[in-house]
Amino acid sequence: MMLEKLQITSKTLIIFLLSISFSSAEILNPDSAISPKEVVSIQLSGLQKNDLKYKDSGIEQTWNFAHPNNKKVTGPLGKFKRMIKGASYQMMIDHLSHTITELGSSDKWAQFE
């Protein structure tokens, strides 16, 4: 009886760990349930560990949350990657740390530094 419970617990734990590893490889999509500060955090954390999930996954995560008007100017994705790796933004890739401070917000906008 005890051995059977241990086997079931072990199988459940293995399935849980596998589901975590598969879900961590996914790029998050914009969702109204994600707060503006969380969006900034997702983008900065992705760039901080740019190649963690796969090559340039952090840049792709940042691109995924970019405003459609921004994408029109900075896209497609390949062009956006080159821009982020260029002189103006390269310090964001694999940066050591960051802080996010809210400067102000309303129902329609939020500003952070």
What residues fall within each predicted segment?
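Short solvent-exposed beta->alpha transition segments
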Residues: 53-107
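Alpha-helical scaffold domains
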Residues: 30-31
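Bacterial N-terminal signal peptides
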Residues: 11-21
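Bacterial N-terminal signal peptides that target proteins for export
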Residues: 2-13
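Boundary at the C-terminal end of the N-terminal hydrophobic targeting segment
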Residues: 23-27
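Short, aromatic-enriched amphipathic alpha-helices that serve as compact interaction elements
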Residues: 35-51, 61, 65
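Short beta-strand segments that buttress and anchor functional surface loops
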Residues: 111-113
